[in-house]
């Protein structure tokens, strides 16, 4: 029992640390500053779209066998493979991991060495990532036993200072659109995209520790999920509160990274800034290690060993290093249109997969993906157009904004279930041959 509890805590800490990356440090304080006295609404939405859905995704994939390919398998095997590959690339070498290296430089290194070039920071950062991830079996232990406790201690010091500060003042806001803002801000962490893939990493580690029975594995996964969620919810809430408590003195239009640095410096002074920098380093490092490992394991799995884990790691880290030189804000802006499109699809698949045994037809999944995908595609194209100074599909995007639940950022919910219902009825009437995938 003691071994199982210890293993649950270690793996839970590791999962928390992998999820809790650069984006997770940057976005909650930003929500707090912009929401002011209504920070709780925005934070609740953020908690739903990130840790809650992410942990649910991990649990669902574990129940389906532990492979990310099981998400979307009932739409079509090729769709499942393509979706998983896209998610791996987004959370790996394209957006999430490069952002960890860029954040380490902008939040920590530049604070003390303003003239230090980005490439030196990235070279050292990704050198460490390569060193740890190259030894695949040591990844979860390295994160859970050593890096996470250090990270939590640093964050604890910051949290205490934020909570006990005597002169906390909250900006007055009307609360309009804060739930939608908080929900969609959670997209940027990309945790929901990575959750199905991380489930495989966690399941592999659980098996390595000697838990071979499926029931024991699921119980372990459930406990790991509870530990990770509790830590994530606590940390996010306190970070958001920290921002809200200083919302009258911080410019809400400032860059997210600069906003975080200012909050901590005001709370703890120069020593606090140093602590925050170290927290960023550890948060970014643990996330980069976890996601890079996931990328290597995924491509080794789908290629049936033809693409080795170590070769994938070498290429992935090299690409991450190059893209990290773009910078945090540029990476965030580039990610918005893509995430706007793919997140509704992923959330729809996770929700339906949670009740997989009660969904009789494969086409029900297809209908849900079509409904969510159309809304996400229109909004993604419009968002990209606006970033480029245009307004392509602006009228259609405005019309979608009138859909039920749009004020909560959930305008895709009704089209998703409508699509699922239409395709279910069509299947029941026509009764086409049901596809069965192993």
Give the location of each predicted region.
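Hydrophobic, small-residue-rich membrane helices and short re-entrant helix-turn-helix hairpins
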Residues: 135-146, 179-182, 202-231, 248-261, ...
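Hydrophobic, membrane-embedded alpha-helices of multi-pass small-molecule transporters
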Residues: 10-20, 161-166, 175-242, 275-287, ...
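Select transmembrane alpha-helical segments in multipass membrane proteins
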Residues: 6-14, 40, 77-90, 120-124, ...
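Membrane-water interface regions at transmembrane-helix termini and the short interhelical loops
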Residues: 62-71, 126-147, 208-211, 321-333, ...
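Helix-loop-helix connectors at the membrane interface of multi-pass transporters/channels
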Residues: 31, 100-117, 207-208, 288-315
